[in-house]
């Protein structure tokens, strides 16, 4: 069987996708190179001094893992040199990351979570890099004077989104608006090869993923949502299977293939985070883009995730994402309580 690389796949789809320009291809190429470097360190994490925390706390109020910090450095170092970016934003950085004056600037904006699920790395559970690609608004092309207003765009304006999953094999799953495609890294040739073309969600899932230990911090509609999947009064006529790793990208990836729903609702556990834990721009929005391209849906309970215009760089949102029928059921329950 003829193997198709990511670059070949992009070139084949350039006529269909306005995103697949030469600049976009160059951007994705450098992003893939950064992911290969990160993957190599993740695979050797138990042999290198990269396990555990740094002792620092990031802008999210979370303890920084050594691999978090390393992945963040790799991505910034590689991507600021591409010549096609005007700015970046990372889960680990409080402010916009601007392209230094010594490098050329382009019109693309890269937003990323450098190592999602990194708290699990010490016990060898899958982690990943989530990314979102935007284009700056017209009228400022070629300028490095990027404002927050250029970056705070709704998810529907994304040019592309995806993630790298570091596990038994390293995968790239991405979409530029022409479906969702999966590529697996062949370490013998150092290339991501097309392994899962045109990924589609099953219309109705069999899995629900949520941290049920927060039950006592949820409101009544949220408890009803979870009870719906735990009980027999659903299209399956029996309880869904609970599968929850605690690594967003790993849980999303499994449910994308098997069907089901991932939920991280708002809770009252932490008063400073009333909207839940997940970040709109570097987690919820890129995964929502993938979900919709794969025939699924993503909502905060009442609103489509891709329609939410962020008011700040690190805005948090509740997230219900997965098979369309399952997300429809969630919204129906919240509507009854509104």
From Swiss-Prot:
Substrate binds at residues 116-119, 211, 244, 277. GO terms for biological process: fructose 1,6-bisphosphate metabolic process; fructose 6-phosphate metabolic process; fructose metabolic process; gluconeogenesis; sucrose biosynthetic process. Pathway: Carbohydrate biosynthesis; gluconeogenesis. Mg(2+) 2 binds at residues 113, 116, 283. CDD domains: FBPase. Its main location: cytoplasm. Signal peptide: none annotated. GO terms for molecular function: fructose 1,6-bisphosphate 1-phosphatase activity; magnesium ion binding. Binds 2 magnesium ions per subunit. Keywords: Carbohydrate metabolism, Cytoplasm, Hydrolase, Magnesium, Metal-binding. Coiled coil: none annotated. It catalyses: beta-D-fructose 1,6-bisphosphate + H2O = beta-D-fructose 6-phosphate + phosphate. Its EC number is 3.1.3.11. It is an enzyme of class 3 (hydrolase). Its cofactor is Mg(2+). It holds the Pfam family FBPase. It is found in: Cytoplasm. One of its GO terms (cellular component) is cytosol. Mg(2+) 1 binds at residues 91, 113, 115. Homotetramer. Belongs to the FBPase class 1 family. This is Fructose-1,6-bisphosphatase class 1.
């Amino acid at each position: 069987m003829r193997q198709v690389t990511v670059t070949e796949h992009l070139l084949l789809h350039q006529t269909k996708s306005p995103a697949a320009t030469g600049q976009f291809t160059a951007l994705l190429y450098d992003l893939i190179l950064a992911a290969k470097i990160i993957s190599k360190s993740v695979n050797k994490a138990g042999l290198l001094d990269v396990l555990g925390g740094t002792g620092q706390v990031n802008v999210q109020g979370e303890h920084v893992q050594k691999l978090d910090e390393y992945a963040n450095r790799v991505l910034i170092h590689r991507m600021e040199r591409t010549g096609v970016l005007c700015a970046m934003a990372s889960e680990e950085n409080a402010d916009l990351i601007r392209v230094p004056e010594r490098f050329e600037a382009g019109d693309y904006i890269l937003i990323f979570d450098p190592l999602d699920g990194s708290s699990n790395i010490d016990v060898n559970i899958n982690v990943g890099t989530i990314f979102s690609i935007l284009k700056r608004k017209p009228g400022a092309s070629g300028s490095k004077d990027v404002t927050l207003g250029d970056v705070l765009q709704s998810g529907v304006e994304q040019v592309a989104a995806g993630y790298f999953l570091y596990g038994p094999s390293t995968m790239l799953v991405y979409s530029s608006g022409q479906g969702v495609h999966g590529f697996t890294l062949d370490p013998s040739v150092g290339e991501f090869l097309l392994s899962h073309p045109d990924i589609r969600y099953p219309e109705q899932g069999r899995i629900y993923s949520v941290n049920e230990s927060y039950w006592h911090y949820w409101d009544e509609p949220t408890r009803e949502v979870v009870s719906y999947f735990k009980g027999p009064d659903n299209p399956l006529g029996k309880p869904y299977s609970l599968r929850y790793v605690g690594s967003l990208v790993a849980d999303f990836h499994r449910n994308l293939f098997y069907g089901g729903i991932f939920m991280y609702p708002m809770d009252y556990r932490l008063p400073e985070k009333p909207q839940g834990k997940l970040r709109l721009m570097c987690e919820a929005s890129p995964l929502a883009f993938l979900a919709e391209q794969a025939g699924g849906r993503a909502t905060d309970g009442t609103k489509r995730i891709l329609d939410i215009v962020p008011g700040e760089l690190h805005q948090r949102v509740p997230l219900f994402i997965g098979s369309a029928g399952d997300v429809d059921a969630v919204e129906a329950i919240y509507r009854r309580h509104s």
